[in-house]
């Protein structure tokens, strides 16, 4: 069965806004519906920059190339509209939002997407019916909804909150930027199981890009493709076995090829 193309990145060159410093130097990447891609590489290779550029972060300027998502040129869309189109970015360090309950934050995001799609917003009672099954899916209890956004959360709770948002917003493309960072083995297993449950619920139609330094999350969520970035370029693409090679040999052997 041939899968439909979801994301196409063509010859993407990016620099920091208001500077001449290039960070991405000709990225090409194709992600089909239902695929899992992992992007690995040393610090400073451009992995996180790529995720933020896809999401529409204003810190970066696209100088050349295209980002096509569901046949739409993302460069014509704001960061908010990209999210409403179905792109979700989970941050390595989720932000705390003082004074805002998690449930209010989540309902605001959910209703924003409904409005973008010209649908009526849901009231608080209806939203509870929607969010409860999602809580169970990621292993959180109801009290979690009434805590302030990420305030006093453990590392695992912050990451679970991100995965809860991913499920609630029914993301077509989820970009997980070092979601495994700072997690112990139990928390990593919990997060991985939650992600796999979400994929199963979507009938494996959601696509995921996992950005990571380490192989361990890929032991739980097996990617279809692994891409290695170095100095702003994808220099090698392979299957899941490439992660094992990188774990044992590092990146220098690729840089010298």
Swiss-Prot record:
Keywords: ATP-binding, Chloroplast, Nucleotide-binding, Plastid, Transport. The keyword Transport applies. InterPro entries: AAA+_ATPase, ABC_transporter-like_ATP-bd, ABC_transporter-like_CS, FeS-cluster_ATPase_SufC, P-loop_NTPase. PROSITE patterns: ABC_TRANSPORTER_1 (PS00211), ABC_TRANSPORTER_2 (PS50893). SUPFAM superfamilies: P-loop containing nucleoside triphosphate hydrolases. Pfam families: ABC_tran. Its main location: plastid. The keyword Ribonucleoprotein does not apply. It comes from the Eukaryota. ATP binds at residues 41-48. SMART domains: AAA. One of its GO terms (cellular component) is chloroplast. Transmembrane segments: none annotated. GO terms for molecular function: ATP binding; ATP hydrolysis activity. It is found in: Plastid, Chloroplast. Residues 7-256 form the ABC transporter domain. Belongs to the ABC transporter superfamily. Ycf16 family. This is Probable ATP-dependent transporter ycf16.
């Amino acid at each position: 069965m041939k899968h439909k193309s979801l994301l196409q990145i063509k010859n993407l060159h990016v620099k920091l806004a208001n500077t001449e410093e290039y960070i991405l130097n000709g990225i090409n990447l194709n992600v089909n519906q239902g695929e899992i891609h992992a992007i690995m590489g040393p610090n400073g290779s451009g992995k996180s920059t790529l995720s933020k550029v896809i999401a529409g972060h204003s810190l970066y300027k696209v100088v050349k190339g295209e980002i096509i998502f569901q046949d739409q040129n993302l460069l014509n869309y704001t960061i908010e509209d990209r999210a409403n189109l179905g792109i979700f970015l989970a941050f390595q360090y989720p932000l705390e939002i003082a004074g805002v309950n998690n449930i209010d934050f989540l309902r605001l995001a959910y209703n924003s997407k409904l409005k973008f799609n010209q649908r009526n917003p849901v009231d608080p009672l209806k939203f509870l019916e929607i969010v409860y099954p999602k809580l169970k899916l990621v292993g959180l209890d109801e009290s979690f909804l009434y805590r302030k956004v990420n305030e006093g959360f453990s590392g695992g709770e912050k990451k679970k909150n991100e995965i809860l948002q991913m499920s609630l917003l029914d993301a077509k493309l989820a970009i997980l930027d070092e979601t495994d960072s700072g997690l112990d083995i139990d928390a990593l297993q919990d997060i991985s199981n939650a992600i796999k449950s979400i994929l199963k619920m979507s009938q494996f139609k959601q696509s995921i890009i996992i950005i990571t330094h380490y192989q361990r999350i890929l032991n739980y969520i097996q990617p279809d493709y692994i891409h290695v970035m170095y100095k702003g370029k994808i220099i090698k693409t392979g299957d899941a076995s490439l992660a094992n090679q990188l774990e044992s040999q590092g990146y220098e052997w690729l840089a010298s090829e």
